[in-house]
Swiss-Prot record:
This is Protease HtpX homolog 1. HAMAP family: Pept_M48_protease_HtpX. The active site is at E141. It comes from Streptomyces coelicolor (strain ATCC BAA-471 / A3(2) / M145). Its cofactor is Zn(2+). Binds 1 zinc ion per subunit.
Length: 304
């Protein structure tokens, strides 16, 4: 079903190109592993199991990792009301609503398609945001579901996960595997090298797509709600408050940066932007400012 979120051709093209390039990388990677390990059955079984688990259970994995739980309307009526209203406005299925008992203010969406999606917010976010700001954040997350970029990021991340697991396996095999002949050690070293290269390339491709999809979600949310200034206020508030959360608490969330409304850790300037999951706060606010002008949105009180 086509939602009322404005389609983004540039996002669609970028997702297609990213998946195509990752597909080529994936085919080459599997071929290299089969040639090196001389066991195509083992390689195919491992790849299929990891891919299946990541694709079909991505929502449960993310909720478990971030201590999220599905909540009913009776427990969070206002949250359900906002999601109901936005889903109706966007003409899309209502996702499952979840809450994570975390002080870090944030939100994320996960799931393999719009009919099997979850939107999760932290209690820290619910305590900090005004209703209009929360609506903007949830519209941002729903747009990820409608544009299907959540599923694309999940699938795209699969190659990096496989490569990372193989690097670790090869490393510990060398470390604790006892005496090995030179041929075995050489094969393990090559497997580690190939896997590390694949991980690095897939990492950069996914990060580039992730940064653009965040801008696309901001744009879609602002146009759906008609209140880009509320989303801008939420971005500013959440980014500032995250900076005050203890670092040890943020490290738990860092692995899921690509799925969050704002990253647990910001990127360093310069080359750091190529490794970032999100565009800078300035980029996001500039875009929302332009949309606000285009829509003729009235300035907030005290900002005229």
């Amino acid at each position: 079903m086509q939602s009322r979120f404005r389609s983004d051709r540039r996002l669609t093209v970028r997702m297609g190109v990213t998946l195509f390039l990752l597909g080529l990388l994936y085919v080459g990677f599997v071929a290299a592993l089969i040639a090196l390990l001389k066991s195509w059955v083992l390689v195919v079984v491992i790849v299929a199991l990891v891919f299946g688990a990541q694709y079909w259970f991505s929502d449960r994995i993310a909720l478990f990792a971030m201590r999220g739980r599905v909540v009913e309307r009776e427990e969070y009526p206002e949250l359900h009301g906002v999601v109901d209203r936005l889903a109706a406005m966007a003409d899309m299925p209502k996702p499952v609503v979840a809450v994570s008992e975390m002080e870090m203010p944030n939100a994320f969406a996960t799931g393999r398609n719009p009919d099997n999606a979850v939107v999760c917010v932290t209690t820290g976010l619910l305590r900090r945001l005004e209703p209009a700001e929360l609506e903007g954040v949830l519209a941002h997350e729903l747009s990820h579901v409608a544009h299907k970029d959540v599923a694309v990021i999940t699938v795209a991340s699969f190659l990096g996960v496989i490569a990372g697991l193989i690097v670790r396996f090869a490393f510990y095999s060398q470390l604790f595997g006892g005496r090995r002949d030179q041929n075995t050690l050489a094969v393990l070293a090559v497997v580690m090298g190939v896997s590390a290269a694949v991980y690095a390339l897939s990492f950069l491709l996914i990060r580039a797509l992730s940064r653009y999809r965040e801008l696309a979600a901001d744009r879609a949310a602002a146009l759906l709600t008609g209140r880009p200034s509320a989303l801008a206020a939420a971005l500013t508030k959440v980014t500032g408050d995250i900076a005050r959360i203890p670092t040890k608490d943020l490290r738990t969330a860092q692995a899921f940066n690509a799925f969050y409304f704002t990253p647990a850790f910001g990127s360093d300037p310069g080359l750091g932007r190529f490794f970032a999951t999100h565009p800078s706060l300035e980029q996001r606010l500039d875009q929302l400012g332009r949309i606000s002008t285009e829509l003729g949105e009235a300035p907030a009180p005290g900002k005229a």
